[in-house]
Amino acid sequence: MIITVNPATAEPIAEYPAMTSGEVREAITLSYWDFIAWRERPLPERAMLMKRLAKLLRIEKEQHAALISLEMGKPLSQALAEVEKSALVCDYYAEHAASCLKPEESKLDGGVRGVVKFEPLGLVLGIMPWNFPFWQVFRFAAPAIMAGNGIILKHSPNVTGSAIAIEQLFRDAGFPSHLYSAVHIALDDVDRLTGFIIEHPAIQGISLTGSTAAGRAVAAKSGKALKTSVLELGGSDPYIVLDDADISQAVDSCAAARLLNSGQSCIAAKRFIVHARVFEQFERLMLQRMQSAVMGDPFEKGVEIGPLARHDLREQLHGQVTRSVAEGARLLCGGTIPEGQGFFYPPTLLSGVHKWMEVYSAETFGPVATLIEARDDSEAVLIANDTPYGLGSAVFSGNTERALAIADQLDAGCCFINSMVKSDPRMPFGGVKQSGYGRELSSYGIREFVNIKSLCYKER
């Protein structure tokens, strides 16, 4: 049995039956037969249904946003934005899949014509997390389905209601009934049944968004089965603030990037590396901003920070903070578990952070910001890259050329200048090092799960 819990009250929401091996096998079989027919559907027909799906998301936006906030605790305003962004990615691939998948022609030797085609791969398993329960799914599923594939979704158990709602959306939009199928697996059966799904011959690709540990496990299983995989894993994104930056604007962007989704995002700002000449000013303004953030019921207007999604996540985050303070970090605000119900954790600011402290380079999944002082640009780059992760990064400077020179040295999948990191359907998204491999979104993302077929022939 799967039980979902309201993180704002710690009270149960609903119970769902966990699927058995036989039920999972049946779901894969039904999805496979729908894929066989779907792969032959012309792109304009696929696009029509994807457009209809985007429209449904917008029509039903309020009810889906409320479910997101109820199950994982993000403020309702942010949940509404998540549903809208999910509709946006559906629109994007409905409008651009044809150009992304357009065959590429070449003239070869001896009058031979070469054509590169992008054909459907098969069923793709999506293993998705709870922190953006709609966006993470649509970011993966929209391009895969437009490419002609079928989807098996294994969502995080604490957002099972969202998984069911998304499955119904695909059916209501007119997609084949089992082309997109969600499987619901109990926590104590995840390893066994996930392995079973990966090994199933109908599954030809795996996309995981999750922890580095989960990525290692899935990569091992995928590699053993010789199946392609895309991994979007953890991050410890550095935000570098140079001495010529607009400090007030930098603080606004940095705080927003740290507190969005109550800090529970792989591309949230984690480490703020600030030039020594402006460190005290940045620290003072950042403290004011963190202290002014409103924490509370995610359904109340004006709330910026809701609860963390689960009790164990709060315990883990608090442990990282207390260990770092014991190692010498200065706690400027927050850092205590509040009394009362729910899994709340206050905005927390740590300064004087240095190497060997846990928060120096590790991923902190919650509203905890760490300040690290750098003497110059070179040291800022060294600190930024001194982490196992390489997902996102940002540089704040009044000199674009200087900022771009630093961006070129950062080991990250993306870098934003004078703004917070965010994903965009038009740009590839993914990381390096222990943040994973492969790309989502844009033309690069839709081509991750296709058969890139070379065709060579002479006209007769």
Positions of predicted regions on the chain:
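Residue-level signal for inorganic ion chemistry
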Residues: 10, 31, 46, 68, ...
